[in-house]
């Protein structure tokens, strides 16, 4: 399951999907695994974070992804983990638009209502286009790269994001 709202609907199914399926994979597959995790494993922290920053997940989604990472790291599999930022953009004709993400919410409101409301706005979002994930991951399919890597293109406040949308 992806995202806080979807995971909160059915915690048991979330754990089965995000944690137990990874455990089953590592127990039955001896090959290399490239795993998409999330920057949400860090929780709410100040300052610039890197891959060695302490984790502190604040949601079931983030907890389940971190637990899956730990299973992968303790397995004998060769594992490459990408901690993805907040994804945006349509990837293909089968993708669904996530209307729970701030970028999409603000854009939809700007288009349909002609205005956006931002409360606070100081929260940061590590944005990442879905095609940038593919650009980063594809070269690693045929390598032996391992480890954990944060993957995002821009860390922007919600207010800055609203201003960018407004300027378009």
Predicted regions, residues:
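NAD(P)H-binding glycine-rich loop region in Rossmannoid oxidoreductase-like domains
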Residues: 1-17
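Conserved sequence/active-site signature of Rossmann-fold short-chain dehydrogenase/reductase
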Residues: 2, 41, 87-89, 133, ...
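A conserved pocket-lining segment of Rossmann-fold NAD(P)-dependent short-chain dehydrogenase/reductase
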Residues: 7, 85-94, 102-128
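Conserved Rossmann-fold NAD(P)-dependent oxidoreductase catalytic core, especially the SDR/UDP-sugar
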Residues: 20-60, 80
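Hydrophobic positions on the long internal alpha-helix
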Residues: 21, 25-29, 71-72, 136, ...
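Conserved beta-loop-beta element that borders a ligand/cofactor-binding pocket
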Residues: 33, 37-38, 69-92
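Active-site helix of classical SDR
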Residues: 64
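C-terminal substrate-binding subdomain of Rossmann-fold SDR/epimerase-dehydratase oxidoreductases
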Residues: 113-168
């Amino acid at each position: 399951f992806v995202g806080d709202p979807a995971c909160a609907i059915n915690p048991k199914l979330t754990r089965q999907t995000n944690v137990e399926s990874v455990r089953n994979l590592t127990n039955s597959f001896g090959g290399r695994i490239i795993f998409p995790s999330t920057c949400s494993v860090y929780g709410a922290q100040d300052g610039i974070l890197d891959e060695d920053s302490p984790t502190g997940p604040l949601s079931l989604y983030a907890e389940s992804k971190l637990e899956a990472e730990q299973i992968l790291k303790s397995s004998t599999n060769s594992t490459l983990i990408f901690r993805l930022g907040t994804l945006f953009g349509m990837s293909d004709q089968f993708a669904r638009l996530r209307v729970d993400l701030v970028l999409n919410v603000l854009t939809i409101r700007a288009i349909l209502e002609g205005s956006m409301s931002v409360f606070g706005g100081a929260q940061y979002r590590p944005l990442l286009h879905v095609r940038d994930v593919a650009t980063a991951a594809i070269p690693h399919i045929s390598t032996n790269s391992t480890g954990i890597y944060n993957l995002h293109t821009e860390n922007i406040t919600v207010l800055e994001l609203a201003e960018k949308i407004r300027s378009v």
